[in-house]
Curated annotation (Swiss-Prot):
Source species: Synechococcus sp. (strain JA-3-3Ab) (Cyanobacteria bacterium Yellowstone A-Prime)
Protein name: Transcriptional repressor NrdR
Region listing for Disordered, in residue ranges: 158-200
Protein origin, superkingdom: Bacteria
Compositionally biased intervals (Polar residues): 186-200
GO process terms (BP): negative regulation of DNA-templated transcription
PROSITE patterns to which the protein is assigned, alphabetical: ATP_CONE
Keywords: ATP-binding, DNA-binding, Metal-binding, Nucleotide-binding, Repressor, Transcription, Transcription regulation, Zinc, Zinc-finger
Domain ATP-cone: 49-139
Length: 200
């Protein structure tokens, strides 16, 4: 390996360690001639994947291109560089495990959005605005509404086991309306009950 500064080949390794979740080895190197220090990464060589672009043309899968797009979307957010790299690693690993030879930019974009949604709403909307080519504020509002609906469904899925789980002994004693794990509504014939107080 040649020194990127002086071009000499007398290089020594100062430090080696696992990186990118075990997907690569990071090595810190030093040129013995000029003293310049630099970092290299050794990665597993996966089978090449071709990316089908919107216009039908094809190009080789480039993880750095995806990472740059994610970094732009995550500017001034709390998402760390490590989290961004892990996001791209996860996408690349998933595609390799699926043993696909071709993948569309549409599929890659959706995979990125799915993961950004868990990291940052701001980054999600930024990436979506470029990926889905927003034309105006209406597109942003539509995307935000869709994101809100998704989060609502996720919260309901997380809360459902809690609502359906049987009550503890103390809850059973304190709440006589609970029968068989299902809360009983007030008697519909009870005209004294306030309908606004019935949980919806």
């Amino acid at each position: 390996m040649k020194c990127p500064r002086c071009g000499k080949q007398e290089i020594r390794v100062l430090e080696s360690r696992s990186a990118e979740g075990g997907q690569s080895v990071r090595r810190r190197r030093e040129c013995m001639s000029c003293g310049y220090r630099f970092t290299t990464y050794e990665r597993i060589e996966f089978m090449p994947i071709m990316v089908i672009k919107r216009d039908g043309s094809r190009e080789s899968f480039n993880r750095n291109k995806i990472l740059q797009g994610v970094m732009r979307a995550c500017q001034k957010t709390q998402v760390s560089v490590k989290q961004m790299e892990e996001l791209v690693n996860e996408i690349e690993e998933k595609l390799q495990l699926e043993d696909v030879q071709e993948v569309t930019t549409l599929r890659i974009g959706e995979m990125v959005l799915e993961r950004l949604q868990r990291l940052s709403e701001v980054a999600y909307v930024r990436f979506a605005s470029v990926y889905r080519k927003f034309q105006g504020i209406k597109d942003f509002v539509t995307e935000l509404e869709q994101l809100e609906r998704l989060e609502t469904h996720l919260r309901r899925d997380l809360e459902r086991p809690l609502r359906n789980s049987p009550p503890s002994e103390s809850e059973s004693t304190a709440s006589p309306d609970w029968v068989g794990g299902i809360p009983q509504l007030l008697d519909q014939n009870d005209t004294s009950s306030n309908l606004s107080e019935i949980p919806k």
